Amino acid sequence: MGKIGFLITARMKSTRLPKKLTLKIMNREIIAWLIDRLKQSDILDEIIIATSTNPQDDILCNIAERENIKFYRGSEDDVIERLYQAAKHFELEYILQITADCPLVSFDFFDKVVENYKETKADLITTFKLPHGFFLYGLKLSALKKVIEIKDDSDTEVWGRYFTETNIFKVKDIDIPKKFQRNN
């Protein structure tokens, strides 16, 4: 298997809770806590913040440098394009993706997503049974490329529909032990 990278999608443009990614818990930014959790994994070749070219996101690049991880700057609104270009830039074959405001994600599930990919070769692997704030996705670079070719919008902040509504991708939601599942 080629390189596996964790792409953290992050921007500073939140309006409901401004600058939420740099709010501190115990003197550490929320995004730094997430990075710490990702560093606990043995399966990742890269951890990358995928942010925008907007100057307000400079602080995220500074945090990436301080935390000794990489960053990529791309489109502000086209999240799929940003993910694809970041993965291509760092020569990733497989991507684990999470939004930066999910600092409590469990590294146990990183391994589960990758194991499922190795078994199923699914284009997208989801963890929808986990509580909100713990979701992560597994994506093949080749599937991202296909979405770039077929998408009809440049605002792809919500991009899952390209995988689930087109009927051209193999999508798998992994089994989550009952004790970790959310109650709807």
Regions found by a protein language model. Give the residues of each.
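Short beta-strand segments
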Residues: T9, I98-T99, F128
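Short phosphate-binding loop-to-helix
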Residues: T53-N116
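Hydrophobic/aromatic residues located in beta-strands of well-ordered beta-sheets
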Residues: F6, I47-I49, I95, L124, ...
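N-terminal glycine-rich phosphate-binding loop and ensuing alpha1 helix
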Residues: K3-T51
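Conserved core of the sugar-phosphate nucleotidyltransferase
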Residues: D58, V105-N184
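Short, structured coil segments at secondary-structure junctions
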Residues: I43, E67-N68, N167
